[in-house]
């Protein structure tokens, strides 16, 4: 169990986990609020 805990706390595993979390969060935000970036700029 200690070896698994050591492996999961290494930098590449934590970085990939963080990137997957951020990507999923951005996908869900875009699903509920589509085109949020384009709505902030007025279109004339």
From Swiss-Prot:
InterPro entries: PSI_PsaJ, PSI_PsaJ_sf
Pfam families hit by this protein: PSI_PsaJ (PF01701)
Localisation per UniProt entry: Plastid, Chloroplast thylakoid membrane
Gene expressing this chain: psaJ
Topology with respect to the bilayer: Single-pass membrane protein
Any Gene Ontology biological process: photosynthesis
Protein origin, superkingdom: Eukaryota
HAMAP family listed in its UniProt record: PSI_PsaJ
Signal peptide residues on this chain, from the entry's feature table: none
TM regions (residue ranges): 7-27
Primary residence: plastid
Function per UniProt: May help in the organization of the PsaE and PsaF subunits.
SUPFAM superfamilies assigned to the protein according to its UniProt record, in alphabetical order: Subunit IX of photosystem I reaction centre, PsaJ
The keyword Methyltransferase is assigned to this record: no
Disulfide topology: none
GO CC annotations on file: chloroplast thylakoid membrane; photosystem I
Protein name from the UniProt record: Photosystem I reaction center subunit IX
Keywords from the named record: Chloroplast, Membrane, Photosynthesis, Photosystem I, Plastid, Thylakoid, Transmembrane, Transmembrane helix
Family of this protein: Belongs to the PsaJ family.
């Amino acid at each position: 169990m200690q070896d698994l805990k050591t492996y999961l706390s290494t930098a590449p595993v934590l970085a990939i986990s963080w990137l997957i979390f951020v990507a999923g969060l951005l996908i869900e935000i875009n699903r509920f609020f589509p085109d949020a970036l384009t709505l902030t700029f007025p279109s004339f």
